[in-house]
Amino acid sequence: MYLQSSFRKSILTLLAGVSLASVVVFAVVPHSIHAQNRMAFSAVSSSSGHVALGLALRKLSVSGTFLQAPAHPDDETNALFTLFGYGMGLRVIDVQNNRGDGGQNEIGPELFRDIAVLRTSELESAHRIDGAEQYFTRAIDYGYSFDPEEVIGKWGRKDIVGDYVRLWRTLRPDVIVTMNIQGRGGDRAHEATTVLVRESFRAAGNPAMYPEQIGEGLRPWQPKKLYFAGGAPGGGGGGRGGGQTGAEAAKLTPVNTGAYDELLGRTYADIGNDAHSNHKCQGVGGLGGGFGGGRGGGGGPAGAAAGRGAPAGADGPPGAARGGGFPGGGRGYTLVDTTISGQLQKEEASLLDGVDTSLTGIAQYAGPNPPRALTIGLAAILTDARTAQKAFAEGSDSGTAAPVEAGLAAVRALRAQLGGLALSEPARYEVDFRLRLKERDYQDAVLAAHDVTFDALADDGLVVAGQPVQLLLTATNHGASDVAVTGVEIAGFEEPGNCALGPAGKGAAYTCNAQAHVPKDAKPTTPYFSDNYWKHPENQAIQIFEPGVPFGVPFAPTPFRVTFHLKAGSAEVTRELPIENRYVKDLYFGDKRMELNVVPAFSVRLAPTLAVIPAASVGGAAKAVEREVHVTVTNGMKSAAKANVTLEAPAGWKVTPASVQIALTHEDESLSARFQVTAPLQPKLGDYTLRAVVTSPETGDRKFTDGYLEIEYPHVQRRQVIEPAEIALKVVDVKTVPNVNVGYIVGVGDQVPPAIEQLGAKLTYIDQDELAWGDLSKHDVIVTGVRAYERRPDLRAYNRRLLDYVERGGTVIVQYNKMEFNREDYGPYPAKVSGNRVSDETVPVKVLVPGDPVFNFPNKIGPNAWTGWVQERGLYFLGDKDPKYIDLVSMVDSFKDNPGEKLGSMVEARYGKGKWIYLGLGLWRQLPAGTDGAYRLLANLIALPKAPAQAAPARKTNGELHR
């Protein structure tokens, strides 16, 4: 079902705001559910209106937590969050094993740490729509693996099981859904994740497991049910493999995410697909299979009408769709462990079968004979919830205010009574844990019933230590009765201004203009996991989390926050939200918001970040190698400033000039200083560091040696990563050929061109016009960037021109592409890209045509050229191909589940007078990492037109000689 564009937009906007009530970050603090530590992910400051009220009311009559535990960002099924969160009113949580650090980037240059930041931001954007909270373990996605035990070994079984146990004890989920342990396709980190989640399921409830957590104040918690994502018969969407058949398929618990929600005007699958489409750096568009089904959606529209207006079940909110077995409307899940007696033998209709998620069910935590005062109190709260829901169903939004106010008072009264009830201390904790959550839900419902929204804006988003900031704090009353602001607390600043208190009449707004100062000792903002990202324990792919940050949160909560205290009817409520800056980056991005980011007074960035110094060149006398280095300084201060820029070089290296003076006239202005850095005449092989230092009379004797990398796209909130202003100088045993002209067709997130320039080649970027009708013969070699055939429609359109260039004697090197390469025959002869890859970066590489120039000129490519590679050998090799293609190398992966000789990673074809080469070897990943052998191989590839003449390569395959 498709909605009109404007209505569709309005629903998404409402959902973005509504999710604020659900997207909460809980610190790991003993004896607290951390309900005040909120994190606003919304593009609007709060939710409002009829839809927001309806969703808030659904939460009041239920109590329970649904949690998914997938491996990587995009493995979650977002429609499950929308079904259980929006549809059923439960708390919904996404606990990712890792941040997807080892993946590819289909929209930009970020890799490793930086793509971890981007993918974390994309998850935040997804949860703005689906309403889930987000957490992570410390595991690092170190790359693709075919062996789950290898993955577990690198993560550290005890460590990551302990992380899951910590999160289960903190979040206390009732139902956990993870991936499918039976899957035999794809990255086996999925299977490893499932193994560890299963081990943690029982460990969390055992106080003898991870006793240090108990010592910190955490309490044992035993979740009630654990499910594996199951597939449709014969495969389907079972979390990347893992289809079940026969009797197993019959026992799958069905979930109908295709149900239609009248309040939202959409199906849960539709909303889930919109959320899932935020995984743009993975090329996700909202469709396709995945974790438990259609990744984002997980279900079609079949049986949708069954959910319209029907009660959700015992004590569930009316008007919501109940997840159940609607044929064709969802996916199935396999119950693998449960504490509910006999449940494994039952045929289930819902993931919640046997789990009491009613509000009155909170009494179960008081034991078999709960105090009568507790059951009476819970019943009274439920009565208020039902009264409010009934008023809403009858069309009286304003009629919901009095009962939700009464319900909030009843929750608070019951919490106050707990100390006097005949409850054990553990029982009191469990009951209060859930009542605190319910108090939060009732406060949200009070604000929704009175239709009050909040905003907290600063006049600057990039601030420096000590800077004054002007704040505009607003509480807007869209409702039918007056409210009053009784308190405003501004946090994170020095000398925050005071706000006069007062009413906000119906249709009016309370505003406060205040000035505050960023603390003089404020540190620059950076992801809490980024400072130590490269310092993880030796031989272990695990992060070091910064102390003091709530465990596993996406990013540390901003310290710059405001808390409003409000009197609405008879209720006193609070709302905390981050202070943001509203800005327009450009017309393409449109109006955006960001939390306040502290930046250095002078941000210092160097280019290039890696300077490769070849040890020798072919022909001519030896001479010292020079590199031009650009130091860009950005003024973070409000005032004009002068800066002195110097470079600290290794002993024996020369820097000219010794220093550069620059004058910055205004905030955010950037100026660059140029330096010539000259290596010694015969530098020793190895790694060196060049550091930039900026000083200024405006900042006394402070030295500025850091800059920040900005990570921002239209679909994510701006994030920055603080980096030292350094260049890695790498003297490499590589020979280069002078006067090589390379034409480059840029692909996705390309970092190969700087490496080509480091090798002394003249690089020219080929744009659409040149590709269409320019003189390509001026290039000795043309290189297409990573996934260029996906990114460049002009390349697909004018590919014939490249083949003509080859036919006349040119050399074309095509870096890896995915299946988009298979739409047409883009090579000189028929060939298809396959999913073949070699994930073990240490396996031997067998050279099949040792006499080919690519292995001999100007560098001899021997075994040492293949050492020191990172993450993998390569991926997306050529598969089925015409015999005219000659494989130059082969490999055998070390993983038993990736058997056989792998060809297609480096393939050459003679066409006319020239050469066409396909390169699945991962130079795009090795070159930025400074892998020596990758530079030698690249030097030979771009030097092919200059190599001595040689006959067509030949090798034997199956006893036949191929030329």
State where each predicted segment sits:
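Bacterial N-terminal signal peptides
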Residues: 13-29
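Active-site rim/loop-helix segments in enzyme catalytic domains that contact anionic ligands
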Residues: 36-170, 191-202, 206
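The feature marks non-catalytic terminal segments
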Residues: 203-446
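Proline/serine/threonine-rich low-complexity linkers at boundaries of modular beta-sandwich domains
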Residues: 441-453, 593-603
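A glycine-rich, often tryptophan-bearing local segment used as a flexible ligand/cofactor-contacting loop or short
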Residues: 787-870
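Catalytic beta-strand/loop cores that center a nucleophilic Ser/Cys/Thr
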Residues: 832-930, 949-962
